[in-house]
Amino acid sequence: MTVPYKGVPIFNPDGTFRKEDDVVQGRSFSSNLTKMLKHMDKLEAIQQGKPPSPVMAHISLTNACNLTCSFCCFANRDISEKMPTEMVLKALDSFRAIGVTGVEFTGGGEPSIHPDFKKIVRYAKDLGFSLGICTNGARFGKDRPIKKDIVELFDWVRLGMYGFYEGYDYDLSVFEGTNCKPSAAYVWDENLETSKNPNITG
């Protein structure tokens, strides 16, 4: 049996899945196939008729945001809900117990403004999760609340990058200095220093 992409066989003759290294062997793959190869245990569970555990959990820490982007469907609202910290920590414990391996902090707001954001991120990393975040980046930087000690804990960062020209700030915030260039540069530099595989997406 082969996968549709480039006819690469992923099964051994006895019907078991081949190891990732045996399948890859210098080939280039689409991101979806690469992800599949990273989770051969899930494929084996499906093959054996067992329900596989989720790979990734997304946690919306808060609906509040520190920006008021004119183009955001959540802009101009008086919302400040946030998940209680203890609930988040218990959820992380539960996710780990059922075999989840990655967590991404996201939501209708900016996750980094949760009052216990740093505590939650450290707790999740201590549990062994791969970590990601969807963020506007406004709080990331050497002179901002989220610094290297937290940035280095993330395996990937999805940073809002709506434009690089200086004038676009007027669309984004009630305060100045939110242009994404400084934040993007900071996160990229710190990731280069602290991660074997820096990964920033816009």
Set out the residue ranges of the language-model regions:
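Short, acidic/glycine-rich phosphate-metal binding loop used to engage nucleotide
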Residues: 78, 109-110
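N-terminal pre-core extensions flanking Radical SAM catalytic domains
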Residues: 1-79
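Radical SAM/AdoMet-radical enzyme domain recognition
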Residues: 82-106, 113-202
